[in-house]
Amino acid sequence: MRINPTTSSPVVSTLEEKNLGRIAQIIGPVLDVVFPPGKMPNIYNALVVKGRDTVGQQINVTCEVQQLLGNNRVRAVAMSATDGLMRGMEVIDTGAPLSVPVGGATLGRIFNVLGEPVDNLGPVDTRTTSPIHRSAPAFIQLDTKLSIFETGIKVVDLLAPYRRGGKIGLFGGAGVGKTVLIMELINNIAKAHGGVSVFGGVGERTREGNDLYMEMKESGVINEKNIAESKVALVYGQMNEPPGARMRVGLTALTMAEYFRDVNEQDVLLFIDNIFRFVQAGSEVSALLGRMPSAVGYQPTLSTEMGSLQERITSTKEGSITSIQAVYVPADDLTDPAPATTFAHLDATTVLSRVLAAKGIYPAVDPLDSTSTMLQPRIVGEEHYETAQRVKQTSQRYKELQDIIAILGLDELSEEDRLTVARARKIERFLSQPFFVAEVFTGSPGKYVGLAETIRGFQLILSGELDGLPEQAFYLVGNIDEATAKAMNLEVESKLKK
């Protein structure tokens, strides 16, 4: 972190201005720049190209040094479009990595990768800035407390609980509900959460970013009347941005979150949607830099890049960062190098299933694939652990019996297995839940279900007390009392039809 003089734009001192280079080559978003002998910029230094294009339009492109090629030449990646750049244009070495505004001034605002506001609400106070490239906290600074982070979503809290100050991944293919789930988590957690949140939109749809901004204004997380009282900072580098911006926007969001943790000593929520796009952008840049591709065409530095980002997302003795990251799974293949590399860094994984989504069960969280390091009796307690294990056992048995049911039918099963199937189908439906952010699509009001209520509901299903209720009574309800009330309504409706 550094304190800048009062100014509304980054200052390039006269000393740094003397270190000038010239563009020698432009290959899409990658520039080769020649500097005078002995004045080579460091790796990750920010370079600024200023000038005018052929029609006289002002150009201001920031790049980041990636390679020193020899012969006084460096290769840099542009953070914005390179349209209008020409060979021979002047390039200024700023002498430092890219720095972005941090602190209270960022709350309620939308930024791009360079830390520039893009919400038309005027300039941001840039007296306090921080470089986006930093080392992870030292081992002795880390905090090891274990506590549960309640989300109000039944399937998450029961089967794969989140750790406060931990890293959580939401895995799923295209169109199974990752962004809706992350928006519901923002709605449930950010509203109740006393600290601040930072949202990093990495390579996702601009429309979703706009929807989220509107949602936050409506819910009061962003206070339009008094921006300073807002609880969230938004950083967007969406699908239409060059790969350099998509590769670095996650670091910009993380830098803002680190300031709240280290300097303000707050508990921070960091949402990243989508971490796969960070890897994808790195893959594009890697190819442009001339590196030999690795497995499935990914960059050979995949593990290093992911590690340098993920190791900074951690809890220290000053404060915590709880990170929730959406992870796109290409072709629904969890063994793809991008999701497989991400798995290693997470405390909890919430895996979304296309099979459940096809059945209309939302959130489409797979109860057997989702895992958490927190699901241990010494952390969550015996009652919670036992209930979760019995739910998983029942679901697993139902999965094993599905082939037999498909070939021979339910009637060929033993009495015990038929009972297991009936309870498993009720559990499957009870794991669905109406979301606050999906009220527009479903027409059902959203429900927040506390952990104690969730455990009680599943215990009643497993004990057999609710065997007489129809399974549709458990679909898209909140707690178990709503399911019993829905069953009574269904019974009344069926009698009226007769």
Curated annotation (Swiss-Prot):
Q: What is its EC number?
A: 7.1.2.2
Q: Name one GO cellular component term.
A: chloroplast thylakoid membrane
Residues binding ATP are 172-179
Which superkingdom is the protein from? Eukaryota
**InterPro entries recorded for this chain?**
AAA+_ATPase, ATP-synt_VA_C, ATP_synth_F1_bsu, ATPase_a/bsu_AS, ATPase_alpha/beta_chains, ATPase_F1/V1/A1_a/bsu_N, ATPase_F1/V1/A1_a/bsu_N_sf, ATPase_F1/V1/A1_a/bsu_nucl-bd
Topological relation to the membrane, as annotated: Peripheral membrane protein
- What does the record give under GO molecular function? ATP binding; ATP hydrolysis activity; proton-transporting ATP synthase activity, rotational mechanism
Print the keywords alphabetically: ATP synthesis, ATP-binding, CF(1), Chloroplast, Hydrogen ion transport, Ion transport, Membrane, Nucleotide-binding, Plastid, Thylakoid, Translocase, Transport
Q: Which HAMAP family match?
A: ATP_synth_beta_bact
Record's protein name: ATP synthase subunit beta, chloroplastic
Protein's organism = Balaka seemannii
